[in-house]
Amino acid sequence: MDLMSFKEREISKKDCVELFEDTENFFDILKLADSIRKDIVGDTVTFVKNTNIETTNVCTMGCKFCAFSVSKNSPEAFKLDADEIAKKAVIAKKSGLTEVTIHGGIHPDVDTHFQVETINKVNSATSKLGGIYTHAYSPQEILNGAENAGLSIKEALKMLNEAGLRTIPGTAAEILDDEVRSDICPLKMSTKKWIDIMKTAHKTGIKTTSTIIYGHVEEYKHIVDHLSILKELQEETGGITEFIPMSFLHENTPLYKSGRVTDGASGLYELKLYAIARILFKESIKNIQAPRVKIGTKLSQLILKSGANDLGGTLVEDKVSKAAGSIYEDASVDLMKNAITSIGRIPKERTTLYEIIE
């Protein structure tokens, strides 16, 4: 296989699967991805000062890869109201953060009107401090909110956009293959519905991130199909700001407890996935994130040498990762910068939309 030819030409799904299966040219594949990264985004590695605000741990989805959710009647259940969420956003702003990511489980009582109220109260509460960027609500949360409010997806997104929502997390993608979804998250939306909501968001003027959860029951072909869907979506709408692979954190999850999965992805698999994503995406999705809070500093640094160019957020609160067994703590700005400079790259703080903060 002529690896260097992939630097100039499109790579097919068949080629991508063959790269996953190729064990002899492992380091050459990583080197190619890193070279493409350098050509497209240079040596800058970005990060964002942010926090997650988990609005509720109640969820009706019952996903087998999740260790965070509980039922509505559980003694451990919580649900923040709009004022409580706004207070957390104020604390984030006073702490010098630039972004709050607001998300939670799929609660049966949450609708679009509550989501709009939350956005309005966060914006109002933080405005006197200069405001904070609100990145909120996955496609599944938007679908749940719209259905509970009796609205179409288009109507719900329009209301959220008018309230000031400019970006949403592209989570709930998991693996964009309905056979796999019927196994690990059977109650979640179909692949087509996820794509439709993302397209509608982009057409409404709301940009999104994009994600994948890997290292569970998927096969290489599922990963490649997923990446190809994201590339096609981006080429159609241009609304994706970044790609965030999320390694399956197996401990405490139903998949692990059932014995079907004994471990998450290997380090070699993770590096290969990032590299192939960069080789496939090239300039279509320029920003690829190595989420340090989920995988740790050392693996993140290796991933930055395998096609990635972003270290993610400081994530002052990430209950989902910690519930699933993540051993990594919140990252300070100094830790982020040191992780970047120690591999010979240039750290830059960014906004949610990848604007550099000097």
From Swiss-Prot:
Keyword S-adenosyl-L-methionine carried by entry: yes
Superkingdom of the source species: Archaea
Gene this protein is translated from: cofH2
Record family assignment: Belongs to the radical SAM superfamily. CofH family.
The protein's assembly and partners: Consists of two subunits, CofG and CofH.
Gene3D superfamilies for the chain: Aldolase class I (3.20.20.70)
Metabolic or biological pathway: Cofactor biosynthesis; coenzyme F0 biosynthesis
Enzyme class: transferase
Ranges for domain Radical SAM core: 45-292
Xref: PANTHER family: FO SYNTHASE (COFH) (PTHR43076), LIPOYL SYNTHASE 2 (PTHR43076:SF1)
Signal peptide: none
Cofactor descriptive note: Binds 1 [4Fe-4S] cluster. The cluster is coordinated with 3 cysteines and an exchangeable S-adenosyl-L-methionine.
Matches recorded under InterPro entries: Aldolase_TIM (IPR013785), CofH/MnqC-like_C (IPR045567), CofH_family (IPR019940), Elp3/MiaA/NifB-like_rSAM (IPR006638), F420 (IPR034405), FO_synthase_su2 (IPR020050), rSAM (IPR007197)
Protein name: 5-amino-6-(D-ribitylamino)uracil--L-tyrosine 4-hydroxyphenyl transferase 2
Cofactor(s) needed: [4Fe-4S] cluster
